[in-house]
């Protein structure tokens, strides 16, 4: 088989969280796939086909919670199937490269549209509580700042990797007022019972995956913060690109190494260390997408209308 060194390098970077954020992971995967298909010197259709399928599976399995990546791979698989019958090397490569580049552009364009729609959500002097370190989070809030809206941001540490430490610096560099809160204190502040007498105007979450029923999967503690906001009658907004929808219920809750919790764990002690949790749709006020603002209950119908190919695609486990 042709050399997969560069493919596997991207896979490793995703697993090691050197490449992070759903959008950047998907873009890295489709970029390396199209680049390698152009570079490799395939002799036969079979060689190119086996390289492509193997590479796609490796990239797809790099992270268990990346529906934007999964949906893109489904899109490419749908383009590959007619090519199998042709068994034409040149036609096959052209089809896969075009599909990869088309989806890459789709990611970029839809992300930009979603960020533009967020400008209508944040008001002057709002105090925003946000969680989940993401590229979209940074770009969305910076877009509101460039719109000359003055507001204040509170955020969590995001243990155990402390991703928000970097994000906080990005905001400070952009002259955005930001305060970091320890993870375990965040619900206390949101509930208006804290000694600082803060009133949070809204909670903004950037999530990893969204289910057909409108519930979302996001980094652990998200359930707690959204539950607190819901019972405190504070609106919860989800920043979302519909390309991240878990159409076929492929996404499971990921767990982390127990050593993060207790390196000296006694032999018979069981430890649960979830990396993600699931937020019920009833806790969510609005989902802001590339196609404007929708209710969680309207999610599946919106995806059906805007991305019918996603609805018709095969689940991952049913692919050849």
For each feature predicted by the language model, list its residue ranges.
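Generic secondary-structure signature for well-ordered alpha-helical cores
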Residues: 16-19, 35-42, 57-64, 78-86, ...
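Conserved phosphate- and dinucleotide-binding cores of soluble alpha/beta proteins
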Residues: 156-320
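Gly/Ser/Thr-rich loops at beta-strand to alpha-helix junctions
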Residues: 23, 127-138, 160
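Long amphipathic alpha-helical segments
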Residues: 1-94
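Histidine-anchored nucleotide/phosphate-binding helix
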Residues: 134-146, 226
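Ligand-binding beta-strand-loop-alpha-helix segment within the catalytic cores
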Residues: 77-124, 142, 151-199, 203
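Glycine/charged-rich beta-loop-alpha catalytic/anionic-binding loops adjacent to active sites
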Residues: 7-16, 54, 95-101, 149-153, ...
């Amino acid at each position: 088989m042709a050399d997969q060194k560069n493919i596997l390098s991207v896979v490793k970077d995703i697993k090691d969280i050197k490449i992070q954020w759903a959008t950047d992971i998907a873009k890295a995967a489709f970029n390396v796939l199209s680049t390698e298909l152009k570079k490799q010197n395939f002799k036969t259709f079979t060689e190119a086909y086996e390289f492509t399928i193997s590479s796609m599976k490796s990239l797809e399995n790099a992270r268990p919670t990346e529906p934007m990546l999964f949906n893109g791979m489904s899109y490419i698989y749908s383009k590959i199937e007619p090519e199998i019958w042709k068994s034409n090397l040149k036609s096959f490569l052209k089809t896969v490269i075009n599909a990869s580049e088309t989806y890459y552009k789709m990611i970029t364009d839809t992300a930009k549209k979603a960020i533009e729609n967020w400008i209508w959500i944040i008001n002057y002097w709002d105090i925003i509580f946000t969680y989940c370190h993401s590229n979209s989070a940074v770009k969305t809030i910076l877009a509101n700042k460039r719109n000359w809206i003055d507001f204040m941001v509170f955020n969590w540490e995001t243990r155990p990797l402390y991703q928000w430490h970097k994000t906080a610096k990005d905001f400070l560099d952009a002259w955005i007022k930001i305060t970091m809160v320890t993870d375990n204190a965040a619900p206390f502040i949101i509930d208006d019972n804290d000694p600082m007498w803060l009133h949070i105007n809204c909670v903004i979450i950037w999530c990893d995956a969204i289910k057909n029923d409108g519930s979302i999967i996001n980094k652990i503690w998200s359930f707690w913060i959204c539950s607190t906001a819901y019972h405190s009658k504070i609106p919860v907004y989800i920043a979302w690109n519909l390309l991240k929808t878990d159409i076929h219920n492929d996404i499971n809750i990921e767990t982390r190494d127990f050593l993060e919790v207790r390196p000296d764990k006694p032999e018979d002690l069981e430890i649960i260390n979830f990396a993600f949790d699931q937020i019920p749709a009833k806790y969510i006020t609005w989902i802001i997408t590339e196609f404007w603002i929708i209710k969680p209950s309207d999610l599946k119908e919106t995806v059906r209308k805007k991305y019918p190919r996603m609805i018709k695609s095969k689940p991952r486990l049913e692919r050849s």
